[in-house]
């Protein structure tokens, strides 16, 4: 089920909120758990046993780790069970066939692919990381093991962040899970509705609209339509325009989903961590990763980079730790070599900055922003082949070897205003304007109502457009 659909906006969400608000205080987590399972099973009912197994493995392992507090060996055994359970499911569904295909291609073997796992369980990359963080935190004694399986299940499958994050650690919401009375206030609900509306507008008014530019240029994989230009017919400037449009679409799509999820979390009485902080205004790649998908980079920093030694064991070890983290970041995004290349690409950039470039970037004013945006856009080009079936080699040939073809002028005339608005919305300017408008209750309500009505009208009048990060 997608947030930006009629069935979610007009059926699931209102019914769920009504049941949740009307439920007795001690039954709210039960309502949340059951409604979240309905949300998950709506289009993925065959993966319901996978979700249940993941919940049970980590719930029971957490209890066992805490129970055997004085027996380190047993604690490690149950932590290992939890890690193997979560990572094993992720590997089986997401990476097993990729490993087999890669082995066949590289080694000349003839391993048969596993049948029946062509479809990836929605959100598995996100909720497995949540269960991993829970079990590790219990082992570290950072949190107490959750004794109520309904409360634990509600944490794992909470629908606002289930499919595409933000990645929420158990300690982020454990206190709120156990507040049965006065969990939410009217101001929280209002703030949540505001965030949800802005997120919906980002998705349908910006991401989908600017994504149409990219589709008009490159087309859609396996689509019978011939109305698009096609990569082979596009000029180099047009391909650059398309990649810029894709970069904007990816940001508004993912940050819009995160904002909707955070907003719904507030409506339910939970404070989820922020996931984006205007990443396209960054003046270095290092800063970009502090602003982009912050819950993922934070997860890898806390559970991989720091345990490996972080910055504490010399420069060589630091660079090696960075290599491992960026490689895993690429692998996390998808079972495809283009994602591995993308992760290694960022490792090289981050290592160069760490070794010598960062002090020079801090002295600059304009060129560091241009440098960062250029490299980030090139990085997003590595994602494209996975989404559209476009030839990776042809795309980069078009980007970096000037070639003729269809001019971008037609597309600039049709999408120019949208491009300008999109670029402005990548900066804090809109937030500053909103902070001024919200001081007056009339302008605040009118702005939210207008955005909600217009966004909903677009949802009603358009076809279903899934969020891009559902693929990861």
What are the residue ranges of the model-derived segments?
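Membrane-embedded transmembrane alpha-helical bundles that form the catalytic cores
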Residues: 1-471
């Amino acid at each position: 089920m997608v947030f930006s659909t009629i069935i979610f906006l007009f059926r699931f969400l209102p019914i769920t909120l009504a049941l949740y608000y009307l439920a007795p205080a001690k039954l709210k987590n039960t309502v949340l758990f059951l409604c979240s399972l309905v949300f998950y099973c709506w289009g993925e009912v065959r993966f319901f046993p996978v979700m249940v197994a993941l919940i049970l493995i980590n719930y029971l392992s957490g209890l066992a780790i805490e129970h055997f507090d004085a027996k380190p060996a047993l604690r490690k055994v149950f932590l290992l069970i939890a890690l193997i359970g979560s990572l094993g499911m992720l590997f089986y569904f997401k990476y097993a066939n990729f490993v087999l295909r890669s082995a066949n291609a590289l080694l000349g073997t003839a391993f048969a692919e596993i049948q029946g796992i062509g479809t990836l369980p929605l959100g598995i990359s996100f909720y497995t990381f949540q269960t991993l963080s829970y079990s590790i935190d219990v082992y570290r004694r950072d949190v107490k093991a959750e004794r109520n399986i309904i409360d634990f299940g509600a944490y794992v499958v909470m629908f606002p962040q289930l499919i595409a994050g933000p990645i929420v650690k158990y300690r982020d919401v454990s206190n709120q899970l156990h507040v049965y009375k006065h969990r939410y206030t009217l101001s929280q609900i209002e703030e949540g509705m505001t965030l949800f509306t802005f997120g919906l507008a980002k998705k349908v008014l910006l991401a989908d609209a600017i994504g149409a530019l990219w589709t008009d240029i490159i087309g859609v994989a396996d689509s019978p339509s011939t109305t698009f230009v096609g990569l082979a017919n596009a000029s180099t400037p047009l391909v650059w325009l398309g990649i810029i449009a894709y970069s904007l679409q990816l940001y508004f799509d993912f940050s819009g989903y995160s904002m909707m999820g955070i907003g719904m979390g507030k409506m339910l009485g939970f404070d989820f961590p922020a996931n984006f902080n205007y990443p396209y205004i960054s003046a270095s790649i290092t800063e970009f990763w502090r602003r982009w998908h912050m819950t993922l980079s934070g997860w890898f920093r806390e559970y991989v980079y720091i345990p490996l030694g972080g910055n504490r064991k010399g420069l060589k070890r630091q660079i090696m730790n960075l290599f491992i983290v960026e490689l895993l970041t690429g692998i996390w995004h998808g079972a495809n070599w283009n994602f591995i290349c993308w992760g290694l690409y960022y490792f090289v950039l981050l290592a160069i900055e760490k070794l010598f470039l960062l002090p020079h970037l801090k002295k600059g004013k304009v060129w560091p922003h241009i440098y960062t945006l250029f490299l980030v856009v090139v990085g997003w080009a590595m994602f494209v082949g996975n989404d559209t079936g476009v030839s990776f080699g042809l795309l980069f040939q078009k980007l970096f070897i000037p070639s003729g073809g269809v001019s971008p002028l037609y597309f600039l005339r049709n999408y120019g205003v949208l491009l300008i608005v999109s670029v402005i919305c990548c900066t804090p300017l809109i937030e500053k304007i909103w902070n001024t408008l919200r001081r007056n209750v009339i302008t605040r309500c009118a702005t939210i109502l207008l955005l909600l009505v217009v966004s909903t009208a677009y949802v009603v009048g358009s076809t279903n457009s899934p969020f891009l990060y559902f693929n990861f």
